[in-house]
A protein has these predicted regions:
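Short, Lys/Arg-enriched N-terminal segments with co-localized hydrophobic residues
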Residues: 8-23
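Acidic, surface-exposed loops and disordered segments
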Residues: 20-223
Length: 223
């Protein structure tokens, strides 16, 4: 019995230590993530690395779990160069290892929605289905807003997960929308929200511009 108690105590301590390591890694990723402007164009990501990253990204939250983001992952060099041109000549897409274009599917709410809660009860599935209809049917503004919110959540997941993997990233919104849409064959019921380049920095990011003081941006209970 004494031996079992010792083993149990050691197991608990290991769990606590593991949790602290994860917590510290998360804090470090947040603090060290920067928008990289110059990427090492010789660095390549393996297909397994891309898959591992995207498996984390699809755990990002979405309203009603409708998973209304769609991701275009680009490693093909000629296509990356086309994207750089659409990005007004910026070098990040062509030099980075991976370009992820985050798009929103504005019709996800009605595309077999029961599957979004396939592991739940029938009652739960029907409840979600009806809630989706109420919120999004005949409301293109809600559809668009929700897609943008979902891609925002996913974008931060991409950047922090990439940092945790020892990679760097750069979010980008400066591009010619119609040109990029043509390159990726964007469906009519989708919109491009942003793109994120992932790779290895060729040079450090410039110093942070400086954050506003907390008391200017954080308010307790109300404005």
């Amino acid at each position: 019995m004494v031996i079992l108690k010792i083993i149990k105590i050691k197991s608990i301590k290991l769990q606590i230590l593991f949790s602290l390591i994860i917590l510290m890694d998360t804090f470090e990723a947040i603090n060290t993530r920067r928008a990289i402007k110059k990427f090492d164009n010789t660095h390549k990501m393996t297909s397994e690395q891309v898959k591992s990253l995207m498996e984390l990204v699809i755990l990002s939250p979405t309203s009603y779990n409708q998973q209304n983001w769609r991701f275009i992952t680009v490693t093909d060099q000629p296509i990356k160069e086309q994207i750089s041109k659409a990005a007004r000549g910026q070098s990040q897409p062509s030099d980075g290892s991976l370009v992820i274009i985050l798009c929103g599917n504005m019709n996800a709410w009605k595309q077999d929605p029961l599957r979004y809660w396939k592991n739940s009860t029938t009652d739960k599935q029907e409840h979600v289905k009806n809630a989706l209809i109420t919120k999004y049917a005949d409301n293109s503004q809600n559809q668009r807003d929700e897609a943008i919110r979902s891609c925002g959540f996913a974008g931060q997941t991409i950047m922090l997960a990439a940092k945790q993997m020892g990679l760097d990233s750069c979010p980008m919104v400066g591009f010619e929308y119609d040109e990029l849409a043509k390159i990726i064959n964007l469906p009519e019921d989708h919109l491009i929200v942003l793109m994120i380049v992932v790779g290895k920095a060729a040079e450090p990011a410039s110093p942070r511009g400086g954050q506003l003081p907390l008391d200017e941006v954080v308010f307790e209970n109300k404005f």
